[in-house]
């Protein structure tokens, strides 16, 4: 039977619940247990698919096409389990489902209330998401005390009672600030945070004390005394120079032993040798490259969380320190390509909307004309095609219909029909809703032998995740190819362009899919690894 570890946060947000949860999950997995993770988001949006990257950060796409919270990216990078649409849900999704059942008459005329109807639906989804895992870690978004999270906290209170203390425990992350002028850590915020939890019937079993300084033994004893938590379960988690150290930090303090004993599980001791290798490669690089990343959302780098991590993973696999130079594409529009000078490679990620697109196109032109290694992702592929059409074909009005519906050469247009992951045909028009209407999830792609992308993957067919509603216009594709645009990857049915390359360029690859969603610190990703190798070759050539 599945054991549940519910994870909450207190005092302030952004303490790193997702990282801490994933790190514990990684240790339990290293002990031979089957582990899964869930993220419960209290906001009322149905999913984050239409939320601004400046507010929410990245939208992580699962294998089965769910648009989810970026924490699911952390989960997949730390454990081997593949997340699905069952691993993330929001208040909006819960209410949508309950109200649909009410409209159908499923509740037989009952008055619909938060308790029991909303809480029952939350519990049902937690159990479904946990599946047949030995241990399921369930992270509750937000901070204890927020009004939005109250139904979720009530639901886990009920579930703890229903499954019993041998199958459920609560891990609470809290801030233990260090006051430099006084030279001491303060435990009072933690005490009050636990008091808030206990007022709604939740007693923590584990406390993770986040701080920028070590939380000493006397402070941990004091916290244990005032919060009714075992002293061995009060864990100090200070800031580290790489998040991939955290499994080792938690293991060294015996957190996994406490969990295993509490649940009465029989399992092996943890083998964290893979994580030791990752940390060693990360902290002891043998080479160094600088890559210019030209994006639209540079004010909030969480909008590119998986991509930034994927570049770090590529550095790990190549024993190379990857310095990312973050450049706002609008700055290129205003200041020119001098911002790109000195970069060993150029990376243009995805995005939506007209703002900053011309700066991205200029960055592509700089990379192509100056033979600088280039990797384009999603919109990064579309702007590569637009740049080629304008500056090689001479179609100065070439554009995407996303940005100019009246373009005389719409080389990129809305996908109106495609087959989803199950083979069902989906259709869209300009009038379709924005939410949940993109080409989403894992799709097979046929790779052309002898291409740069084939050199990276070493396969004829690959599977990568997508999140887009625009594609290369097949009506203009023959002319583009005649002029030298190389199409090195197509969808399984051959209908959609997935990868393009530039002839007579040392390394120019642009893909419609999002390879960053499947990159992990232990295995890296072949495309990003190849990109960093190309950047190293460029640097050594200079």
UniProtKB/Swiss-Prot annotation:
<dbReference type="InterPro" id="IPR004468">
    <property type="entry name" value="CTP_synthase"/>
</dbReference>
<dbReference type="GO" id="GO:0005524">
    <property type="term" value="F:ATP binding"/>
</dbReference>
<comment type="subunit">
    <text>Homotetramer.</text>
</comment>
<feature type="active site">
    <location>
        <position position="514"/>
    </location>
</feature>
<keyword id="KW-0479">Metal-binding</keyword>
<feature type="binding site">
    <location>
        <position position="13"/>
    </location>
    <ligand>
        <name>UTP</name>
    </ligand>
</feature>
<feature type="binding site">
    <location>
        <begin position="379"/>
        <end position="382"/>
    </location>
    <ligand>
        <name>L-glutamine</name>
    </ligand>
</feature>
<feature type="binding site">
    <location>
        <begin position="14"/>
        <end position="19"/>
    </location>
    <ligand>
        <name>ATP</name>
    </ligand>
</feature>
<comment type="function">
    <text>Catalyzes the ATP-dependent amination of UTP to CTP with either L-glutamine or ammonia as the source of nitrogen. Regulates intracellular CTP levels through interactions with the four ribonucleotide triphosphates.</text>
</comment>
<dbReference type="InterPro" id="IPR029062">
    <property type="entry name" value="Class_I_gatase-like"/>
</dbReference>
<dbReference type="GO" id="GO:0019856">
    <property type="term" value="P:pyrimidine nucleobase biosynthetic process"/>
</dbReference>
<keyword id="KW-0460">Magnesium</keyword>
<feature type="binding site">
    <location>
        <begin position="186"/>
        <end position="191"/>
    </location>
    <ligand>
        <name>CTP</name>
    </ligand>
</feature>
<comment type="pathway">
    <text>Pyrimidine metabolism; CTP biosynthesis via de novo pathway; CTP from UDP: step 2/2.</text>
</comment>
<dbReference type="GO" id="GO:0005829">
    <property type="term" value="C:cytosol"/>
</dbReference>
<feature type="binding site">
    <location>
        <position position="71"/>
    </location>
    <ligand>
        <name>ATP</name>
    </ligand>
</feature>
<dbReference type="GO" id="GO:0042802">
    <property type="term" value="F:identical protein binding"/>
</dbReference>
<feature type="binding site">
    <location>
        <position position="139"/>
    </location>
    <ligand>
        <name>Mg(2+)</name>
    </ligand>
</feature>
<feature type="binding site">
    <location>
        <begin position="146"/>
        <end position="148"/>
    </location>
    <ligand>
        <name>CTP</name>
    </ligand>
</feature>
<keyword id="KW-0315">Glutamine amidotransferase</keyword>
<dbReference type="InterPro" id="IPR017926">
    <property type="entry name" value="GATASE"/>
</dbReference>
<feature type="active site">
    <location>
        <position position="516"/>
    </location>
</feature>
<feature type="binding site">
    <location>
        <begin position="186"/>
        <end position="191"/>
    </location>
    <ligand>
        <name>UTP</name>
    </ligand>
</feature>
<dbReference type="GO" id="GO:0044210">
    <property type="term" value="P:'de novo' CTP biosynthetic process"/>
</dbReference>
<dbReference type="InterPro" id="IPR033828">
    <property type="entry name" value="GATase1_CTP_Synthase"/>
</dbReference>
<dbReference type="Pfam" id="PF00117">
    <property type="entry name" value="GATase"/>
</dbReference>
<feature type="region of interest" description="Amidoligase domain">
    <location>
        <begin position="1"/>
        <end position="265"/>
    </location>
</feature>
<dbReference type="GO" id="GO:0003883">
    <property type="term" value="F:CTP synthase activity"/>
</dbReference>
<feature type="binding site">
    <location>
        <position position="222"/>
    </location>
    <ligand>
        <name>CTP</name>
    </ligand>
</feature>
<dbReference type="Pfam" id="PF06418">
    <property type="entry name" value="CTP_synth_N"/>
</dbReference>
<feature type="active site" description="Nucleophile; for glutamine hydrolysis">
    <location>
        <position position="378"/>
    </location>
</feature>
<feature type="binding site">
    <location>
        <position position="71"/>
    </location>
    <ligand>
        <name>Mg(2+)</name>
    </ligand>
</feature>
<feature type="binding site">
    <location>
        <position position="402"/>
    </location>
    <ligand>
        <name>L-glutamine</name>
    </ligand>
</feature>
<dbReference type="GO" id="GO:0004359">
    <property type="term" value="F:glutaminase activity"/>
</dbReference>
<feature type="binding site">
    <location>
        <position position="13"/>
    </location>
    <ligand>
        <name>CTP</name>
    </ligand>
</feature>
<feature type="binding site">
    <location>
        <position position="469"/>
    </location>
    <ligand>
        <name>L-glutamine</name>
    </ligand>
</feature>
<keyword id="KW-0547">Nucleotide-binding</keyword>
<dbReference type="GO" id="GO:0046872">
    <property type="term" value="F:metal ion binding"/>
</dbReference>
<dbReference type="InterPro" id="IPR027417">
    <property type="entry name" value="P-loop_NTPase"/>
</dbReference>
<comment type="similarity">
    <text>Belongs to the CTP synthase family.</text>
</comment>
<dbReference type="InterPro" id="IPR017456">
    <property type="entry name" value="CTP_synthase_N"/>
</dbReference>
<keyword id="KW-0067">ATP-binding</keyword>
